[in-house]
């Protein structure tokens, strides 16, 4: 078991959120930081685009601009995510790769098990569904994405609780 530094929940804009994760990855890589779990929100609401996606393919940029929603690219893969300022908590887990299972599916399960434990402690009957989702009943409430770079793993994840679904579908393609 390793000790992690926990950064409590804070709101930042999309660009600051992604820059913080990149800076933390670099500090973990150089040994200047313990592994980190960071909880955060997006102010204003934002769309994060997976590393390998085309921004214009995934987001209606005119609608996002009109709604005051930032659009940013993540370091992690996966699909486009709408981050509702008032409806979700995002987490980043950043640590040396040797702290996590090498197998991608097992590493998602390893990290999501802790998210499940926290949700179940709060009375939420949630379950992990491979490869990287957490469901309550048949409703997805959490998804995550990873990257591994220079010996460091970064996993982003969201836990949804009150998303403006109408706005989300207006902005995501």
Predicted segment positions?
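Generic detector of intrinsically disordered, low-complexity, polar/charged segments
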Residues: 47, 65, 74-76, 140, ...
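Catalytic beta-strand/loop module used to bind and position nucleotide/cofactor moieties
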Residues: 81-83, 88-173
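Active-site loop/lid in soluble adenylation, ligation, and acyl-transfer enzymes
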Residues: 1-70, 74
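Generic hydrophobic/packing signal
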Residues: 15-17, 25, 51, 76, ...
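A glycine-rich, hydrophobic loop/mini-helix early in the fold
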Residues: 58-97
């Amino acid at each position: 078991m390793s000790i992690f530094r926990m950064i409590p929940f804070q709101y930042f804009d999309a660009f600051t959120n992604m820059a913080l994760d990149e800076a933390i990855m670099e500090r973990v890589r150089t040994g200047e930081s313990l592994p980190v779990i960071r909880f955060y929100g997006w102010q204003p609401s934002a769309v994060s685009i997976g590393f390998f996606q085309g921004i214009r393919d995934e987001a209606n940029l005119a609608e996002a601009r009109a709604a005051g929603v930032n659009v940013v690219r993540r370091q992690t893969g996966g699909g486009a995510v709408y981050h509702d300022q008032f409806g979700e908590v995002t987490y980043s887990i950043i640590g040396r790769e040797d702290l996590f299972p090498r197998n991608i599916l097992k590493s998602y399960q390893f990290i999501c098990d802790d998210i499940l434990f926290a949700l179940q402690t709060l009375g939420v009957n949630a379950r992990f569904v491979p490869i990287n989702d957490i469901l309550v009943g048949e409703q997805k409430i959490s998804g995550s994405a990873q990257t591994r770079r220079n010996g460091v793993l970064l996993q982003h994840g969201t836990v949804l609780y009150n998303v403006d679904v109408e706005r989300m579908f207006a902005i995501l393609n």
